[in-house]
A protein has these predicted regions:
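Active-site acidic short loop of glycosyltransferases
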Residues: 39-41, 71, 96-97
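Hydrophobic beta-strand anchors of alpha/beta hydrolase catalytic cores
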Residues: 44-45, 74, 120
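Structural microenvironment flanking redox-active thiols in thiol-disulfide oxidoreductases
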Residues: 56-94, 105-110
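Thiol/disulfide oxidoreductase modules built on the thioredoxin-like
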Residues: 92-96, 103-148
Length: 153
C-alpha cells in the first residue's frame, strides 16, 4: 500500500513539473513561448494601435528592423488588447510581419500600458527594461539604440 501511494505521489510530481514547462505566453503570428525561453535574450516590445497613424507608419520600420536583427526578439502588442480573432485581419491589413503578443507585457515583464502610442521598450537579457521610447521609431533609430545597448553589457 505504501509503495502504491509513493508511486502515485511521484507520478503527480512529474505531471506538475511537466505542466510548469508549458508555453504560457500567447503569441499571434509566431510561436507561443514562456519566460524561460525569453530570458537571456534582448527583446523589443512595440505598443501600437490601428487608429494611430504614427504606429501604422512605424510598422514597416519594425518589420525591417526585425528582419535585419535576428538576435533580438521583436514583438508588437496591440494597445487595445485585441484578441486573436480581432487582431488577425488588422495585422494582415497593415502587413505586420513580426509576432504579436496576446499575453499582456504587464504579465510578463511588469510593463504597464503606456499612456500613448507608439511606445517601444527594449528589454535586456536579464528581463529588465533598458530603454523606453514614447515616439515613433525608424529602423535606423532602433538599430542605433540597440547597438548602444549591446555595447553597455
Amino acid at each position: 500500500m505504501y509503495l502504491k501511494k509513493a508511486m502515485i505521489i511521484q507520478l503527480f510530481c512529474i505531471l506538475v513539473l511537466v505542466s510548469c514547462q508549458r508555453n504560457d505566453i500567447e503569441v499571434f503570428n509566431g510561436s507561443n513561448t514562456n519566460i524561460n525561453d525569453l530570458n537571456g535574450n534582448w527583446i523589443l516590445i512595440n505598443y501600437w494601435a490601428d487608429w494611430c497613424a504614427p504606429c501604422i507608419k512605424e510598422i514597416p520600420e519594425l518589420n525591417d528592423f526585425a528582419a535585419e536583427n535576428k538576435n533580438i526578439k521583436v514583438y508588437t502588442f496591440n494597445f487595445d488588447e485585441l484578441e486573436i480573432d480581432d487582431l488577425k485581419p488588422i495585422a494582415k491589413k497593415f502587413n505586420i510581419k513580426v509576432p504579436s503578443l496576446v499575453t499582456h507585457p504587464r504579465d510578463i515583464w511588469g510593463i504597464a500600458t503606456p499612456p500613448a502610442v507608439p511606445a517601444t521598450y527594449f528589454i535586456n537579457p536579464n528581463g529588465e527594461i533598458a530603454v523606453s521610447l514614447f515616439r515613433p521609431q525608424t529602423k535606423d533609430s532602433l538599430n542605433k539604440i540597440y547597438i548602444e545597448l549591446k555595447n553597455t553589457i
